[in-house]
Swiss-Prot record:
Belongs to the UPF0114 family. Pfam families: UPF0114. It is found in: Cell membrane. This is UPF0114 protein in repA1-repA2 intergenic region. It comes from the Bacteria. The keyword Magnesium does not apply. It comes from Buchnera aphidicola subsp. Geoica urticularia. Keywords: Cell membrane, Membrane, Plasmid, Transmembrane, Transmembrane helix. GO terms for cellular component: plasma membrane. Disulfide bonds: none annotated. It is a multi-pass membrane protein.
Amino acid sequence: MEKLIEKIIYASRWLMFPVYIGLSFGFILLTLKFFQQIILVIPKILIMSESGLILIVLSLIDIALVGGLLVMVMFSGYENFISKMEINVDKKKLGWMGTMDVNSIKNKVASSIVAISSVHLLRLFMDADKISNDKIMWCVIIHLTFVLSAFGMACIDKMSKKNYS
């Protein structure tokens, strides 16, 4: 009975597969949004203010950071929880694939969230004259919370690696 339960639990990891497929579709949608932003800015580029262009570029950077986060979560999650990817090492395999454990994924996700939050905050500061001080204050507080959380997770990871060594 115990062996059967273990086989069922082990096989249930495949239930995550549709989640990773869904993230792939999310990545496609994000890519479409990226190109939509570029297409919309092209006709306006010569009449657009410098700060307006910077806001668009920050938006593109934001989309790129979220896309990178999605790719990292999809690939490393699939490899850690479902199955190893059998990719020809000489040609296509990314250098970090197969080397990230759950803790390093968490730290990279936290770092990505801080970077994304930083871009949002910078975009907010570019339009600070149109935004209430309360909203700016709360955005800064939330950003600092992300920073402290990422720092705390990195410290805990470093301490746990020291204790296992």
